Every structure is written in structure tokens, then in C-alpha cells.
From Swiss-Prot:
HAMAP family found in the cross-reference section: UPF0597 (MF_01845)
A molecular function (GO) term: L-cysteine desulfhydrase activity
Name of the molecule in the record: UPF0597 protein CV_1824
Annotated GO biological process: L-cysteine catabolic process to pyruvate
InterPro entries found in the cross-reference section: Ser_deHydtase-like_asu, UPF0597
Name of one Pfam family that matches: SDH_alpha
Organism: Chromobacterium violaceum (strain ATCC 12472 / DSM 30191 / JCM 1249 / CCUG 213 / NBRC 12614 / NCIMB 9131 / NCTC 9757 / MK)
Family membership noted in the UniProt record: Belongs to the UPF0597 family.
Length: 430
């Protein structure tokens, strides 16, 4: 191993272990549910009412999504059931043990006007705070900058925990600052298998979500619709159709409130699905063995993380597009394209999808998952044929890492006003 590999490879393993984790339900409402669950535990008494505040971006991403196990949309129900039945030790799976009675109690709390929600005047892009009351007693918990990153705990005004968000981040932080796409590729292809074998769980969890989504009872049931159109002769069978139906079905289930966890990426279940299911579909098509699948998944998820480190945690840019760039890398490798095809496919996707907006988490996210998966496979086919969007076109550069950096600039600097306008439009609809 080179000195560079000795330094970077442990960072890659830490990045995968920190960013690719199971999550039940859309992670923005779940973050508020976790804050409420932690506050309820601190209070130690039956919650009677809840005051909650979230950042503007978290408000945008939580307004239109179904909270798993509840059949109800929005942040207030997440706070209510989090306080009444959440397991604070389960973190992003905080709602995994909800009972029918707890869900009913949460809905009654909403009907009685006992849950108040507002936008917090904070600089944090990701922020969730819950104050859970019993009589005049109150416990307050705040989470900032990462979905499980607790920065404040108070009980009846007494501070139990308070720290700056930067100081509260997980011990296992990682640094991909000077990494390149080529570094990621070399790691995924040559790392000891036992150091990345855990990534196979992504295929297991997200495939189960896809199977559940194919039942047709979740969200916009796009995956199931596409399958019915195949059977009706309106859409041809084949690898592309399989990629689209399975990837989209998993997102349907995820956004439609299925009580199954997704393997997330960079704090998002849809990003985890987007980075997983196209790779799984292609691996099955080429009859890849377990090691080949694991390495393709590691490549996909780590490329997704690498690109996301160049983006804000939440922004106006739909990050399913960037997670799907990881999937394109994994698919290109499975189809024997090697690193040249990987870099070409990513460049073409930036030329294709850059600027797709995030207008909040909702059932329609599955549309964007489908679009991004299709773009990824198209870019791979182009790369295998020696074609890519070139550095002479738009924000795409000759070098893939420069193209990724340009995409990051677009999201960070160019789309800030877009984000504000999207939220205003959504708030006007309430």
C-alpha cells in the first residue's frame, strides 16, 4: 500500500460505517421524533403536550412525508409518536416499536391541538428541538447538524447537556478532504473484503423495501405501476425496466410509510436506495458473485458519500441525483467498464441532472429516484460506448473531480435563493 492509501483507506471505512446505516422512515421527521423521544425519557412522565421547532430546511423535508406506522403525513405526528412511543436508544429507528395504541394516542394529541410546530431562528441547516410537557414540567432536547447529533438537554430549565454542534459530532468522524474519485475506486476494488463486507446489508434491507413497494399500496406506487405496464405490453421487459421498477418501488415503500428500515446514505433513506438498488439489479443480471456485489456496493455508496461531502447537509439540490452517481459507478464496474467508465458516467450524469430541485420529502421523491436511476444507467451505456458529456459543456469539466466540485458550488452558492423560494411556496400552501 502507498502512503496515501494507508492514510485514506481507514477514512473510507469510517465514512461508510458512519454514513451507511439503517433508518426507519424519512430521516428529517425521524430526527424530530428522536428529539421528542429523548425529551420524554428525560421528563419521566406521560407527555401531555409538545412544542417543537425545526430549521427551515427540515421543515421543507418533513412537511409532506408519511411517518412510518402512522399513515399520517408531517412533522407533528412524528413528534407526537416519538414522545409517546419512541425508543431513543434506537436512534434513526426510533419508531420501530410503535404500537397501535401509541399511534392512536399521537393522533388524538394532534386532534386536541396539543402539538405546536414552528420554524426555529437558528443558523443550522438541520435542527430539531422538542419540548415535552406534563403539567408545568418540561424536558427539552435539541438536535443539530446531523440527524442524531444531540446538542442540548434541559429539564425544567436545568441544563443537563449543552455543547456546540461541532463538539457534539460522532467520535468516528472522517476526513475525505483531499480524496479523489480514483482513490475511492481503488479502495473499493482492493480493500480487504472483511473491512467492507457489512455493506451487503444495504442490498438485503433495500431489496426487502423494494419487494414491499411492489405490493402497490405505498405512496404513488410507481414501481408497481411500471410493472403492470410491462405486463400490459406498454413497457418492455429488460434490465433498464428492472432497475427502474425495483429502485422506485423501494422509494415508494420508504416514502409511503412502510414499517421496514432502509439502509441510508448520508442521512437519507432515498439516497441509500438510489445507491443500492440499481447496483443490485445489474449484479443479478450479470450473475455477480457476493464479493463482486460487495465491491460494487462499496464503490457506489462511497462515491455517493464523497460527492455529498461537497454539498450542504440539506439544500435545494436533490441529493438522490448524487447518490445515483454512485450507483452509476457501481453499475459501470459490474459491466466491466473499469475506472474510465466510472468517471465518464459520473460526468455525464452531472451534465444531465445538475439542478434538480429538492422540494421536500414526499411520495413524489420516488419520481426523482426513478429519473435518477434511469439517468445513471443511460450514462453507463454511453460510457461503455466511449461517450460522455465533455468538459466543453456547461458545468462539466474534463476532470471528474472538478465536475463534482462544480456541482458542489452550484448547490452551496448558486441555489441558496432557490431553497428560500421553494420553502416559501410550500409554506404558502399550508
Amino acid at each position: 500500500m502507498s502512503e496515501r492509501e494507508v492514510r485514506l483507506w481507514p477514512e473510507f471505512v469510517k465514512a461508510l460505517k458512519q454514513e451507511v446505516v439503517p433508518a426507519l422512515g424519512c430521516t428529517e421527521p425521524i430526527s424530530l421524533a428522536l428529539a421528542a423521544a429523548l425529551a420524554a425519557r428525560e421528563l419521566g412522565k406521560a407527555p401531555e403536550r409538545i412544542d417543537a421547532w425545526v430549521s427551515a430546511n427540515l421543515m421543507k423535508n418533513g412537511m409532506g412525508v408519511t411517518v412510518p406506522g402512522t399513515g399520517t403525513v408531517g412533522l407533528p405526528i412524528a413528534a407526537a409518536v416519538g414522545a409517546l412511543g419512541g425508543d431513543p436508544d434506537a436512534k434513526l429507528e426510533v419508531l420501530k416499536n410503535l404500537t397501535v395504541e401509541q399511534v392512536a394516542a399521537g393522533k388524538q394529541m394532534l386532534a386536541d391541538g396539543k402539538v405546536k410546530l414552528g420554524v426555529a431562528a437558528v443558523p443550522n441547516i438541520l435542527y430539531a428541538e422538542a419540548c415535552v410537557w406534563h403539567g408545568d414540567e418540561c424536558a427539552r432536547v435539541a438536535i443539530a447538524d446531523a440527524h442524531t447529533n444531540v446538542i442540548k438537554i434541559e429539564l425544567n430549565g436545568e441544563v443537563k447537556l449543552k455543547r456546540e454542534a461541532a463538539d457534539a459530532k460522532p467520535v468516528e468522524t472522517y476526513d475525505l478532504g483531499d480524496a479523489t474519485a480514483r482513490d475511492v475506486y481503488d479502495f473499493a476494488m482492493r480493500a480487504p473484503l472483511d473491512s467492507i463486507a457489512f455493506i451487503h446489508d444495504a442490498a438485503v434491507l433495500n431489496s426487502a423495501l423494494a419487494d414491499e413497494g411492489m405490493s402497490g399500496k405505498y405512496g404513488l406506487h410507481i414501481g408497481a405501476t411500471l410493472q403492470r405496464q410491462i405486463e400490459a405490453g406498454l413497457l418492455s421487459e429488460g434490465l433498464l425496466s428492472n432497475i427502474l421498477t425495483r429502485t422506485t418501488a423501494a422509494s415508494d415503500a420508504r416514502m409511503g410509510g412502510a414499517t421496514l428500515p432502509a439502509m441510508s446514505n448520508s442521512g437519507s433513506g432515498n439516497q441509500g436506495i438510489a445507491a443500492t438498488m440499481p447496483v443490485v439489479a445489474v449484479a443479478e443480471h450479470v450473475k455477480a458473485d457476493r464479493e463482486t456485489l460487495i465491491r460494487a456496493l462499496a464503490l457506489s455508496h462511497l462515491i455517493a458519500v464523497y460527492i455529498h461531502t461537497r454539498l450542504p447537509k440539506l439544500s435545494a439540490l436533490c441529493a438522490v441525483t448524487t447518490a445515483s452517481m454512485g450507483a452509476a459507478a457501481g453499475m459501470a464496474q459490474l459491466l466491466n467498464g473499469g475506472y474510465p467508465a466510472v468517471s465518464m458516467a459520473i460526468s455525464s450524469m452531472i451534465g444531465d441532472l445538475a439542478g434538480m430541485i429538492c422540494d421536500g420529502a414526499s411520495n413524489s421523491c420516488a419520481m426523482k429516484v426513478s429519473t435518477s436511476a434511469g439517468s445513471g444507467y443511460k450514462a453507463v451505456l454511453m460510457a461503455l460506448d466511449g461517450t460522455r458529456v465533455t468538459g466543453n459543456e456547461g458545468i462539466v469539466a474534463h476532470d471528474v473531480d472538478v465536475s463534482i466540485a462544480n456541482l458542489g458550488k452550484l448547490a452551496t452558492q448558486g441555489m441558496a435563493q432557490t431553497d428560500t423560494q421553494i420553502l416559501q411556496i410550500m409554506m404558502d400552501k399550508r
